[in-house]
C-alpha cells in the first residue's frame, strides 16, 4: 500500500488519532495526503506546526472564519439548509452535505488524488471516502473513535436519524473497520452484523519521563482532567464537590482545554460556594498532543469522569485514560460500561467510583490522600504499563496489518 488518503471533518490537532496513523504510514515511505477542514479556532496555531513539519501532506478545504470567510460561510449555510431538507428528502446529496460541512469540497479533492486507500476518520468523512473510492477504484477504511448513532438520547432526534442513515448507507462499503474501544466495536457489530471491527486503542507513542513522587504530605494533591473542550455534563462539578467534601486537605483540580467564559465562571462560582480556595481550581489553555505528556506528568491523578450519557459516553474509551497511564498518573474513573471493563482488565491502574455517588468519588480521592506510597507505586506501575503494553508502538501493528493486507 503506497498511497493513502485520509479524510476528516476536523483539523489535525483535533484528531490526534488520525495524525498518529498518518505519521506512521509516512515514516514507512507511503505517500500520505490528509484532507481536513477548519473546526476550532484554538487549533490553528498547533496545526501550523504540524503542516510545517509535513509540507504538502495536509490539504484544507471549506474555508475558515478569518482568511477564507466567504467560502466558510457558504459551506455553513449549505450544511444548515441540507439539515433542514433531510427531513423531506434523502436525494441530491442532501444527507452527505448535512453530515459534513465540507463534503462537496473534500469529495472533489479526493477524487483527483491517485491513491490506493481512503481512510475516513469520523462519520461525516465516510461518504466522501466511499464515493471517491467508487470513482477511483481504491479501497476504503473507516475508524470509529465514537459510536455516532449512540451520541443521542432519543431515536426521534433528527440528528440521530441522519447519523443512522449514513451508517446504514455506507458501512457496508468499507474494506476494514476499526474502533477505539471494545464496546464501540461490540455495539456496532450488534447493529451491523456484517462488520468485523478491529479495536485499536487510543494510545500514544512512548515518552521517556521521570516519574517522581509529586505528592507529599502537607502539599496539594493535584488532580488533572483534559479534553478539547471544558464543558457541562463532563463530571467536573462532581469532582469539585468531592474536593470540598474532603476536609482538612488541600486538593487542586487542573483542567486543560478550551473553555468559554460562561462555563469557566460557573465552575469557579461552584468552587467558591463550596468554600474552596481560588488556587484549588486551575484552567490551562489547549496544547498540542506532542506537549501533553510532559505537561500532564506534573500531576498526581488523572480523572476519567464520563457520565455515561448518552450511550456513546458509556461505551467509549477516550485518550484521557491512556494518556494518564502513559504519563505515570494514577487514575480515578467513573463506572461507565467501558471504563469498568477496562479496570477489570487492568485493576492496578487506579480506582473506580460509582457515577452520581458523591461519597464514592470522595472515598477514591481520600484513599490517595491518605496513602501517598500507594499513589506513587500506582503511578510507577502505570508508567511501566505504558512503556510495555499500552502504547502506539504496540498498537500500531493492528493498524498496519489491516492496511497491508487489503
Label every PLM stretch briefly.
Residues 183, 202-203:
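Carbohydrate-associated surface elements
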Residues 39-41, 252-268:
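Glycosyltransferase donor-sugar binding loop
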Residues 92-111, 127, 131-135, 142, ...:
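Membrane-proximal helix-turn-helix segments that form the acceptor-binding/catalytic region
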Residues 345, 350-358, 367-373:
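Conserved acidic donor-binding segment of nucleotide-sugar-dependent glycosyltransferases
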Amino acid at each position: 500500500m503506497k498511497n493513502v488518503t485520509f479524510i476528516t471533518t476536523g483539523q489535525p490537532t483535533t484528531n490526534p488519532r488520525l495524525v498518529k496513523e498518518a505519521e506512521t504510514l509516512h515514516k514507512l515511505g507511503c505517500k500520505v495526503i490528509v484532507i481536513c477542514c477548519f473546526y476550532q479556532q484554538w487549533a490553528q496555531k498547533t496545526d501550523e506546526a504540524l503542516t510545517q513539519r509535513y509540507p504538502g501532506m495536509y490539504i484544507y478545504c471549506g474555508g475558515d472564519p478569518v482568511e477564507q470567510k466567504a467560502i466558510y460561510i457558504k459551506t455553513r449555510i449549505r450544511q444548515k439548509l441540507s439539515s433542514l431538507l433531510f427531513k423531506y428528502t434523502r436525494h441530491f446529496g442532501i444527507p452527505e452535505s448535512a453530515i459534513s460541512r465540507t463534503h462537496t469540497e473534500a469529495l472533489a479533492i479526493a477524487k483527483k488524488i491517485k491513491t490506493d486507500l481512503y481512510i475516513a476518520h469520523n462519520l461525516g468523512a465516510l461518504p466522501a471516502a466511499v464515493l471517491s473510492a467508487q470513482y477511483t477504484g481504491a479501497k476504503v477504511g473507516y475508524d470509529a473513535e465514537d459510536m455516532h448513532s449512540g451520541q443521542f438520547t432519543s431515536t426521534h432526534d433528527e440528528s440521530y436519524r441522519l447519523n443512522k442513515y449514513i451508517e446504514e448507507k455506507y458501512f457496508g462499503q468499507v474494506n476494514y473497520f476499526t474502533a477505539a474501544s471494545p464496546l464501540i466495536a461490540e455495539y456496532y457489530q450488534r447493529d451491523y452484523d456484517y462488520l468485523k471491527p478491529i479495536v485499536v486503542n487510543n494510545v500514544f507513542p512512548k515518552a521517556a519521563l521521570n516519574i517522581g513522587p509529586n505528592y507529599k504530605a502537607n502539599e496539594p494533591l493535584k488532580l488533572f482532567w483534559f479534553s478539547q473542550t471544558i464543558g457541562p455534563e463532563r463530571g467536573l462539578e462532581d469532582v469539585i464537590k468531592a474536593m470540598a467534601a474532603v476536609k482538612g486537605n488541600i486538593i487542586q483540580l487542573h483542567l486543560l482545554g478550551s473553555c468559554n467564559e460562561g462555563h469557566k465562571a460557573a465552575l469557579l462560582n461552584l468552587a467558591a460556594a463550596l468554600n474552596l480556595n481560588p488556587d484549588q481550581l486551575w484552567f490551562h489553555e489547549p496544547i498540542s498532543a506532542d506537549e501533553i505528556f510532559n505537561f500532564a506528568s506534573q500531576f498526581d491523578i488523572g480523572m476519567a469522569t464520563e457520565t455515561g450519557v448518552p450511550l456513546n459516553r458509556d461505551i467509549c474509551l477516550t485518550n484521557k485514560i491512556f494518556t494518564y497511564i502513559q504519563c505515570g498518573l494514577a487514575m480515578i474513573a467513573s463506572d461507565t460500561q467501558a471504563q469498568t471493563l477496562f479496570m477489570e482488565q487492568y485493576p492496578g491502574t487506579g480506582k473506580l467510583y460509582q457515577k452520581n455517588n458523591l461519597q464514592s468519588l470522595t472515598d477514591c480521592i481520600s484513599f490517595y490522600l491518605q496513602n501517598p506510597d500507594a499513589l506513587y507505586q500506582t503511578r510507577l506501575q502505570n508508567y511501566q504499563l505504558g512503556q510495555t503494553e499500552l502504547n502506539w508502538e504496540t498498537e500500531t501493528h493492528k493498524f498496519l496489518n489491516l492496511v497491508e493486507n487489503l
